[in-house]
């Protein structure tokens, strides 16, 4: 492990940035390569400021460009693959999502074989496990239970197939005669400062007189704070390189949660934003069964219009199910094999996220005031 190097794909993303910040603190790490299709100028600047004893190399390239991936993997010890097209709303074309999430992962695995990279960590998703029905109830689920998404929607399907490919690649022969070892992490819904989904929710609420959308009040989930999700990746990178720990980790997947209280998505949004005057919509909400069938009708309309018009429904059956199901998982296996313990407790995570939300509220209130003038 002395003098190791790490490539992080999707490094400009919400989770990827946190992983980079933590990696540069690793004592034996010589170089971290941050790969993404495009980096925002502020992200690139932040990574440049991280230059300490660990060299930070920023690379822009496409996950579908095999030559780019092969160059990025040269001389690398560990790949952490977070890059993905995340979409449960139907905004991104199906084939684009499958190309990025599945074909991109296959390209990266092949690049690892050709460049003789011995360790590969895949950022999977809780979506690969389901839920498949809003009537399904899973409380403190674990890896020994059989939970697999049956949705054909492109995001859960592509992530599921990519995870299967990653775990199947464990034990593959590398070009230099070595062996590839892989594992996958399945984080719960990730929240925290700079969350793209929370940003959209808060900005919409500010524009709607401080009223938060109510979309998931019937759910019970256990979200994970972004720093804790990132920390699990660091531990996986250490573990796959540790001869004592690696045999237990190879070819395995892990649910990654923390000590955030079990609650609905709506309750989480409210708890994180209530200090800034935001409140949930108290108007009548249709029952889940009705929303589910409305989602089916909207999907049908979208399908029928597809030859002449690209209609994107406001919601679909998959989103209704995701947002209104009891679906929580334990991190005990990660605790046992990776030595995972959450770095940040719930109160600190809540305060950090709430403070960031406050800055977002003030920023967009100012925008509204400017427009009003």
UniProtKB/Swiss-Prot annotation:
Q: Which InterPro entries match?
A: 3Beta_OHSteriod_DH/Estase (IPR002225), Lipid_A_modif_metabolic_enz (IPR050177), NAD(P)-bd_dom_sf (IPR036291)
User: Which is one Gene Ontology cellular component term of this protein?
Assistant: endoplasmic reticulum membrane
Report the gene name.
HSD3B1
Protein family per UniProt: Belongs to the 3-beta-HSD family.
Q: Name one GO biological process term.
A: steroid biosynthetic process
Q: Which residues form the active site?
A: 159 (proton donor)
Q: Which reaction does it catalyse?
A: a 3beta-hydroxy-Delta(5)-steroid + NAD(+) = a 3-oxo-Delta(5)-steroid + NADH + H(+); pregnenolone + NAD(+) = pregn-5-ene-3,20-dione + NADH + H(+); 3beta-hydroxyandrost-5-en-17-one + NAD(+) = androst-5-ene-3,17-dione + NADH + H(+); androst-5-en-3beta,17beta-diol + NAD(+) = 17beta-hydroxy-androst-5-en-3-one + NADH + H(+)
- The species this protein belongs to is Mesocricetus auratus (Golden hamster)
Top-level taxon in the UniProt lineage: Eukaryota
Where found in the cell?
A: Endoplasmic reticulum membrane; Mitochondrion membrane
Q: Keyword annotations for this protein? A: Endoplasmic reticulum, Isomerase, Lipid metabolism, Membrane, Mitochondrion, Multifunctional enzyme, NAD, NADP, Oxidoreductase, Steroid metabolism, Steroidogenesis, Transmembrane, Transmembrane helix
Q: What is the lineage of its organism?
A: Eukaryota, Metazoa, Chordata, Craniata, Vertebrata
GO molecular function annotations of the record: 3-beta-hydroxy-Delta5-steroid dehydrogenase (NAD+) activity; 3-beta-hydroxysteroid 3-dehydrogenase (NADP+) activity; 5-alpha-androstane-3-beta,17-beta-diol dehydrogenase (NADP+) activity; steroid Delta-isomerase activity
* Pfam families linked to this entry: 3Beta_HSD
Question: Which protein, by its recorded name, is this?
Answer: 3 beta-hydroxysteroid dehydrogenase/Delta 5-->4-isomerase type 1
């Amino acid at each position: 492990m002395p003098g190791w190097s790490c490539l992080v794909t999707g490094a400009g993303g919400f989770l990827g940035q946190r992983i980079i910040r933590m990696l540069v603190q690793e004592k034996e790490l010589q170089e971290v390569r941050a790969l993404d299709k495009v980096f925002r100028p502020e992200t690139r600047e932040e990574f440049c400021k991280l230059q300490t004893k660990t060299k930070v190399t920023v690379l822009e390239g496409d996950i579908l460009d095999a030559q780019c991936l092969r160059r990025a993997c040269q001389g690398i010890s560990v790949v952490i693959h977070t890059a993905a097209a995340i979409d449960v709303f139907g905004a991104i074309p199906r084939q684009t999502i499958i190309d990025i999430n599945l074909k991109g992962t296959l390209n990266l695995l092949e690049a690892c074989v050709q460049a003789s990279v011995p360790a590969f960590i895949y950022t999977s998703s809780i979506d690969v496990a389901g839920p498949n029905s809003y009537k399904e109830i899973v409380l403190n689920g674990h890896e020994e239970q059989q939970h697999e998404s049956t949705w054909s929607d492109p995001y859960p399907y592509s992530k599921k197939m990519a995870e299967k490919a990653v775990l199947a690649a464990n034990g593959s022969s590398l070009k230099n005669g070595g062996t590839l070892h892989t594992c996958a992490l399945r984080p719960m819904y990730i929240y925290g400062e700079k969350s793209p989904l929370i940003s959209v929710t808060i900005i919409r609420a500010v524009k709607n007189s401080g009223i938060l959308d109510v979309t998931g009040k019937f759910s019970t989930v256990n979200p994970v704070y972004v720093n804790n999700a990132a920390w699990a990746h660091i531990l996986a990178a250490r573990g796959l390189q540790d001869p004592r720990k690696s045999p237990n980790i190879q070819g395995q997947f892990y649910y990654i949660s923390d000590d955030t209280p079990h609650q609905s998505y709506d309750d989480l949004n409210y708890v994180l934003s209530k200090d800034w005057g935001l409140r949930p919509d108290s108007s009548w909400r249709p029952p889940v069964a009705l929303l589910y069938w409305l989602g089916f009708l909207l999907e049908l309309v979208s399908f029928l219009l597809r030859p002449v018009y690209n209609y994107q429904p406001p919601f679909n059956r998959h989103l209704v199910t995701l947002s209104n199901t009891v679906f929580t998982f334990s991190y005990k296996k990660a605790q046992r094999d990776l030595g995972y313990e959450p770095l940040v407790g719930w109160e600190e995570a809540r305060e950090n996220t709430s403070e960031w939300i406050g800055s977002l509220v003030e920023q967009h209130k100012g925008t509204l005031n400017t427009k009003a003038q």
